Amino acid sequence: MSPRYIYRLIQAFFKRFKAIIFVGIFVGILFFIGLYFILPNITSENQTIGIVGRFTPDNMPDEISLKLSKGLTTINKEGNIIPAIAKSWESPDDGKTWIFSIDENLIWSDGKKITTKDIDYAFSDATVDIVDDKTIKFNLSSPFSAFPVILSKPVFKKGLVGTGEYKVKTISLAGGYLQKLVITKKDEKITYKFYPSDDRLKLAFKLGAINKIYKIEDPSDFNEWKTVEIEKEIGYNNFVGIFFNTENENLSDKQIRQNLAYAIEKSDLPGERSIGPLSPNSWGYNPQVKPYDRDLSKTKDLKDTKIILSTLPNLLKTAEKIKKDWEEVGILCEIEVVSDIPENYQAFLATVDIPKDPDQYSLWHSTQTSTNVSRLANPRIDKLLEDGRIELDQETRKKIYLDFQRFLVEEVPAVFLYHPEYYTIKRK
């Protein structure tokens, strides 16, 4: 068969079927273009996560902010401060001035190098000096040894540009609060949706609006579901406790508060037992404080004592359990469900975020009238809190905070009950 014959045969074939061939080529090109743009979305890991709470772009949950960026410092599992954006720091004057040197090899997620001019924590009680592109100085009004802990909060440039692997793709706000936030990393996309209550969050999951619930305390709605996985973790950075109004005439006596603590059976409470104000993971934690295990011999003087126990709605079951324990020893207890701490309360049941540093000046010092919920005024505890926040040596600070916990628990401005259980629920 001659080459000329083969050429004419091919020419005749194309002439007869050219329309079909061109359509096939066109469809093939469209197919490969579609694969290029669509396949990543098919194969990528996409999650839609629901979270309860009101958050702003400046105050996001750690679950999100730590994916997007980091601070000058960060905190390890033991609660110790370690370098992050800053590679080193020092205080030349015992905690009033802090100088940080940033890592010159780090970049923002937009590819630009990080300089000290980009760092803006917007502190109202500190001035900032930019020494050079790699050195920044903070001038405080008074010495504060825990200042590097404050700088563990992730920082961002304008547009929520951070230093993490994830980037913000879209953000939706309502009245300044986050409604929806989409972040991406290579082929992964995570959509966060925010809800005002656990009930709204659970409904969204049931309706398929989200495929993962982040940290709720009551997963019972889904215990019988075969299509979900439920993961439990202990919230060691929180405690549930009863705060006593130490200015109330019925509760101003330390002995009464101690006896009320002894009246509660703590072994059958949810979560993991808490005995003090610090996380057991903290380097300053004191495991040797008085535990106030139930002791009915200490409760004889409580008969006919009247107490109103105010509680947030999510802790109502715990409040009812405490009411039962108290009534068993003759206490007349009434439960009041509230959305916030009442101005003139007697006992208030709440979940508290434990500060990342052992410094709890704002929670217990007598001068902190807006945050000292129990209205505690104890000179010895005040002095320990004052000493702890100006001492730079960690071992010396630890001794101070061991004493602080011992005296605070003895004073019983609050009964420390448990570290709560949190549940994350996701579809299989």
Language-model features, listed with the residues they occupy:
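Detector for C-terminal structural segments
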Residues: 259-288, 317-321, 343-428
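Gly/Pro-rich hinge or "lid" segments in bacterial periplasmic/extracellular proteins
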Residues: 76, 133, 139-192, 196-199
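N-terminal lobe/hinge region of extracytoplasmic solute-binding protein
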Residues: 47-93
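Ligand/substrate-recognition segments at binding pockets and active sites
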Residues: 23-24, 299-354
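Aromatic- and charge-enriched surface segment that lines or borders ligand/interaction sites
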Residues: 88-127, 204
